[in-house]
UniProtKB/Swiss-Prot annotation:
Record protein name field: Probable HTH-type transcriptional regulator LeuO
UniProt KW Transcription regulation keyword: yes
The family this protein is said to belong to: Belongs to the LysR transcriptional regulatory family.
DNA-binding region, residue range(s): 39-58
Domain HTH lysR-type: 22-79
One GO-annotated biological process of the protein: regulation of DNA-templated transcription
PROSITE patterns, A to Z: HTH_LYSR
Keyword S-adenosyl-L-methionine: no
Annotated keywords: Activator, DNA-binding, Transcription, Transcription regulation
A molecular function (GO) term: DNA-binding transcription activator activity
Native source organism of the sequence: Salmonella typhimurium (strain LT2 / SGSC1412 / ATCC 700720)
InterPro entries, sorted: LysR-type_TF (IPR050389), LysR_subst-bd (IPR005119), Tscrpt_reg_HTH_LysR (IPR000847), WH-like_DNA-bd_sf (IPR036388), WH_DNA-bd_sf (IPR036390)
GO cellular component: protein-DNA complex
Length: 314
């Protein structure tokens, strides 16, 4: 009698959470509460009642085995675990949203929030241009700007906590896209009253002068590329938090500074500055627009990318 083979039933690993047992609608509630950090406002955004949102938050706490949100003043404050989850949840929801029928992006009616990092000193020239363009053609869209990179910027781009970065830094990892927008000429700036400088310097003379710089301790400091050795750093006499304050100090002292030509020209008359060619190999910097590749499939992200390129590219 032939042996009859029977298939063994597939047993679920009950020790692991099963996705089919998770109410994925709770993730949209989590996303809204994270953005609003207020139950009432999140309920309004979602078109739900406040008790329904509170109930969903209670279920989320059980799902993730964490408090997620704690009371803080008149609102709530996310826990460390909530912040850890936020980027992944947003990215997952956005990927699903992009595949739904009719998921087009209409800028004239959208109330979307975009988070941009326009790094100093570029924020001095680009932030107002971007803000005014968005306000003109998409008045309901809200753009939130910040002006510096930090150690978490790649993480923020990866999870779309920051959608775009405009800076002199190129993101070289394969998962990021960096598009060159323009190249800035760099110049040497000194006071017109400087006792030793009244014309162009030779390369060997640059570091014989004392320098004012953007703090070299800051992450991705604008000034850092020119002060990458102990000898060059020994010429630094003043470190400020922003390039405008650096130029202000230069105008009142015998220090010199390196700056983009457009910024030096903007303040040359009011601060009585002289602008000289920079006789160093690094005498220009490329400005890049950068984002994470996963965000590129989002239609709203594509719209903002096109707008930023049209505003910023020279």
């Amino acid at each position: 009698m032939p042996e009859v083979k029977t298939e063994k039933p597939h047993l679920l690993d009950m020790g692991k959470p099963q996705l089919r047992m998770v109410d994925l609608n709770l993730l949209t509630v989590f996303d809204a509460v994270m953005q609003e950090q207020n139950i009432t406002r999140a309920a309004h955004t979602l078109g739900m009642s406040q008790p329904a949102v509170s109930n969903a938050v209670a279920r989320l706490k059980v799902m993730f085995n964490d408090e997620l949100f704690v009371r803080y003043g008149r609102g709530i404050q996310p826990t460390a675990r909530a912040f850890q989850l936020f980027g992944s949840v947003r990215q997952a929801l956005q990927l699903v949203q992009n595949e739904l029928p009719g998921s087009g992006f209409e800028p004239t009616s959208s109330e979307r929030v975009f988070n941009l990092c326009v790094c100093s000193p570029l924020d001095n020239i680009l932030t107002s241009q971007i803000y005014n363009r968005v306000e003109k053609i998409a008045p309901n869209i809200h753009v939130v700007f910040k002006a510096s990179l930090n150690q978490n910027t790649e993480h923020q781009l990866r999870y779309q906590e920051t959608e775009f970065v405009i800076s002199y830094e190129e993101f070289r990892r394969p998962e990021f896209t960096s598009v060159p927008l323009f190249k800035d000429e760099m110049v040497l700036v000194a006071s017109r009253k400087h006792p030793r400088i009244s014309g162009p310097l030779l390369e060997g003379d640059v570091y014989n002068e004392q320098h004012a710089v953007v703090s070299l301790d800051r992450y991705a400091s604008f000034s850092q590329p020119w002060y990458d050795t102990p000898d060059k750093q020994s010429s630094v006499a003043y470190q400020g938090m922003a390039l405008i304050s650096v130029l202000n100090v230069v105008s009142q002292t015998h220090l010199v500074a390196i700056a983009p030509r457009w910024l030096a020209e903007e303040f040359a008359e009011s601060l009585d500055l002289q602008i000289l060619p920079l006789p160093l190999k690094l005498n220009s910097r490329t400005c890049y627009l950068s984002w994470h590749e996963a965000a590129g499939r989002d239609k709203g992200h594509q719209w903002m990318e096109d707008l930023l390129v049209s505003v910023c590219k020279r």
